[in-house]
Amino acid sequence: MTKTVFVLNGPNLNLLGKREPGIYGVATLDDIEASCKREAGQLELQIDFRQSNHEGDLVSWIQEAGEKNAYVLINPAAYSHTSVAIHDAIRSARVTVVEVHLSNIHAREAFRHHSHVSAVTKGVICGFGAEGYLLGLRALAAIAKEEENNGQSIKGA
């Protein structure tokens, strides 16, 4: 059975390739989406790739993923450090989530060291640039395979 992964991207990620390339790299969000689609095909996953600068959109999409029994690969961007709403959405949707960040948030400003989202995810990948998205998809594919082999759903953190 092919599993769907919602790849959700938070604020300012639409500016990738132009915004602080020394921190975030030169890949655009379109480049990352294309890479994710290629990787998903090899992993037998379907992806639904989305970006919004609005917290409520991300919350609604997480809820939608839960309703569709999909997985979530999320780069909440700055909302990692501020959004109790995204934390609560993940917890209430009981959806399997991997959090990804292009930069190593622990090697940056102190206010970026804490993520409200991390506590309700299966895992966090940070500091590997655009490759982090592919690592996240591989992790979710492994979880899907484990669920299929065990005949059960492994939800939440």
Swiss-Prot record:
The record marks R19 as: Transition state stabilizer. Its EC number is 4.2.1.10. Keywords: Amino-acid biosynthesis, Aromatic amino acid biosynthesis, Lyase. GO terms for molecular function: 3-dehydroquinate dehydratase activity. GO terms for biological process: amino acid biosynthetic process; aromatic amino acid family biosynthetic process; chorismate biosynthetic process; quinate catabolic process. Substrate binds at N75, H81, D88, L102, S103, R112. InterPro entries: DHquinase_II, DHquinase_II_CS, DHquinase_II_sf. Pathway: Metabolic intermediate biosynthesis; chorismate biosynthesis; chorismate from D-erythrose 4-phosphate and phosphoenolpyruvate: step 3/7. The active site is at Y24 (proton acceptor), H101 (proton donor). It catalyses: 3-dehydroquinate = 3-dehydroshikimate + H2O. Pfam families: DHquinase_II. Belongs to the type-II 3-dehydroquinase family. Catalyzes a trans-dehydration via an enolate intermediate. Homododecamer. This is 3-dehydroquinate dehydratase.
